[in-house]
Amino acid sequence: MDIAKWVEHARTCYSTQLDTKIKVIGVIGKDYPDHGKGDNINCYLRENVFPVAATEDETCTIRGHFSEDDQILFLVMNGVDDVANIRKCLKSNPKSNYFDAMAESECQQIRMLHFLFISCHFIIIFEQTSRIDLELMRFLKKVNSARIQLRKKINQRLVASDLRDVSFNNRILSSAESEGRMVVPRLLIAFQRNNIRPDVNPGKKLQRELYEKLEKNLDNQFSDILKLYDLIDCGASSLCQLNETIPVVHLLNPKIVKRDIIGEMFEILMADAENTKISGNAGTLPSNNSFVKFLEDNFRSEKNEISLENVIELMNCLQCVLDGDLEEKHEKTAIQTFIKRIQNDHMEEARRLYTNAQRPGERRGADRFKDSEKPVKIRSKEEHLMRFNEATHYIDSVVGVNSREALSQLQAQCNEMWQSDMRACESVSMMGRSCVRKIHPTFGDQTAPEHRWTAHDASNTMISTCVCGRKQLIRPEPFSVKEANSDFYDHPDFKCCRRLWRYQFQLYQEDSEEKDDIMWADRESNSLRAAKKMAQREDELAEEDTDLDIPESLLDPDSTSPSDEDDVRVRTMSSSESSSQESDAYLRPTSRRDESMASKTERELTIDHVKRMQKLELAGKSEDFLITVPNSMTTGKLPIFPSWHLTSLGDSSIYSHGAGLKNQPNFKIGGDYLSPVVVLLDVNFDVWNRDLNKIRSEDFSRKCGKDNKDDSARVKLFVGFEYECSRGHRFFVDYNGEPLIYSKGSNVIRESAHRSSLGNVLQADLPIRRPCTCRKLPLQSAQLQKVHVVTPKAPVHITIDPKVLIPTHEGVYGTGQEPLELHHSKYYILHLPTVYSGPSGAWMPGEFNPEKQGVWMGGALKVAYKPVMSFKW
């Protein structure tokens, strides 16, 4: 009978069993002329309880039957898709058409399903086909939405009826999961038909194996579909659940369940005519043993916890769900739903404008594009505001009512999207480009753990040469002065530079640091005594190897000749790597600090520097040192890292003016020659000859010199002002700042002497940046990066004191120290800063400027006579 009538008469009919613990089972499915969903329950009960098909008076109702033997209350729902309901809708009132009648039936079905899913232990779905009905899954999703919407009101009814604390089953639910319902039902599904061939012998074991395999596959498919529609595994938002250990899918055996409907009708008719009882299977139905076992296995998995009396009270309390008393009026709900849908559409379009996403209809065509062609979601603050203004303009144009509320909601959503997943870092590199990463914790960020610290990335690289010029590497754009001027030149791949003497510039040191170790290297490097010790070291090594020049294997013209093309060719092998027999004559002294730094990675060194800076800041010493390039405006302070580098490649015999530079990559053919410079000295010739003979005798004893019969008071140096662009192209310039390239086949010695006579490159003011010799677009600017000096074998005192002027910057950039002393008969390279940063900020020139920028002030290199006897060697 109908559930309302069953509730009304249940207390009277089952008065003796009101305390019996029972289960509540819901049954849903479709009725067909030859088979109804209630037939399978009849087979389980072995009696005709539910009709084969519902009548038109029983459409969209729930039929109830309590089995005293099984202690189960069965609730069978007659739904929208039953044949009787479709027939009824076709015969509907002329004032309402078929579609209106079906819409009303669907609303009632949502209420009935809602009723079942909050009051049944198990719900059995009978599928008359061999496939899962996705339309039913979509319908259940609507039911779940209705349940979530009304759960607070239903919970109030349950509390008012004192049913909230009643134990419904042995499953424990959280307060959120139990709100608005007594139980989360377990779902079972049975298929009336299957795809197994009918000619398979049912008596064979193969048939059962086929059934089990198909059931297992359907079980997995059923679980995936429920998850796809968010019906299970969603916490408090789940509509139902599945048993994890017992199968929930069963294939009915059609040969056993199939009924002869015409035969039954004939027997009933004959029984009425003869006024006799129905014989045979009319009163007792055959049982599908496997289906009965399937149900019993699932039913036994839960204990009966709720009494029949409480179930009757629950059904009576939940009549409000079936009647629709908790729902708002249909007209009001429809209008609100329409308005809300329009608002959601407008907000979705506004979000699409902000994110620059494609409309749903355009996604199919967009799928053929690669991921690299999709719009970049990371945005700077400027881009964020621009996109937000577009979305705001759209909302203003389409929303008339409550536009302020919509704009406030849009602003909150856009800000949340930008802050959470779309905000760009926006840190600017020393070359003027922004970091392309999402906002991230940088080195020293106290709000994030150390392992999350990430370096910036401008998504742009350039090619730079090491201090000695023998190797080039690709480097990312630096984001700090230290990274640009110091860290890169300590790269572990620059092994060629580690083996050379390098001047130790005075750096800021705390009292607790290894000041003695650092200052020892400082004193030893900046004195002629250090040069003498280096010469003595060469003498010791010369006894084993008299040849102090670079090995011939490194002078192979095929490996050192630069290309005439503009394409960048980066050397991956330096001279120190190409031969294991290289002389150790120019090994630089190592300190304890050098050894400790060599064992650490680049990241560890960066973290150590950051922690040191934080320590100095906490100690209030952040103003005691420089984190920029020394400047005349910042006298009295020492830098915390070097921006200038001075190194000695070794003896002056390394350079041969007739052959040019060796092992220096990326020079153009004819562009790897230094400029000879003759310096006249005002000196007493007798003293000059005496000191010159002294130098000669020492050189002869060390087998490093040649006879020099020229006793005139003049000396010759070889100097080169080297420029380098971001592509790694290198070239020298003359006194006018123009590229110095000798044509093929020319006499370099004669032509260079002629060019030197035209102007003194030592006294010339040269540009810091000028156009590169590149012909490949886009054109590049090159920067003065190195000064090469080959000192003569003569009793002279040579110093270099660089001074640089930068446009719009105050003061003069320099080393911040006394002029640097250079020993005679050596090859030196002074490496200039890559980035000039001072009190006026950092200099960030563009990629290309046809004009010359900045000034290297002439007169930085000075040569003076100093008698040898005045030195204490």
Swiss-Prot record:
GO CC field: cytoplasm; striated muscle dense body
Biased composition (Acidic residues): 540-550
GO biological process terms held by the UniProt record: nuclear-transcribed mRNA catabolic process, nonsense-mediated decay
Bias type Basic and acidic residues, positions: 591-604
Biased composition (Low complexity): 551-562, 574-583
Pfam families reported for this sequence: Smg8_Smg9
Keywords on record: Nonsense-mediated mRNA decay
Region (Disordered), start-end ranges: 531-604
InterPro entries associated with the record: SMG8-like (IPR019354)
KO phenotype (gene knockout): Defects in nonsense-mediated mRNA decay (NMD).
Superkingdom, taxonomy of origin: Eukaryota
Family: Belongs to the SMG8 family.
Function: Involved in nonsense-mediated decay (NMD) of mRNAs containing premature stop codons. Probable component of kinase complex containing smg-1 and recruited to stalled ribosomes.
Name of the protein described by the UniProt record: Nonsense-mediated mRNA decay factor SMG8
Protein encoded by which gene: smg-8
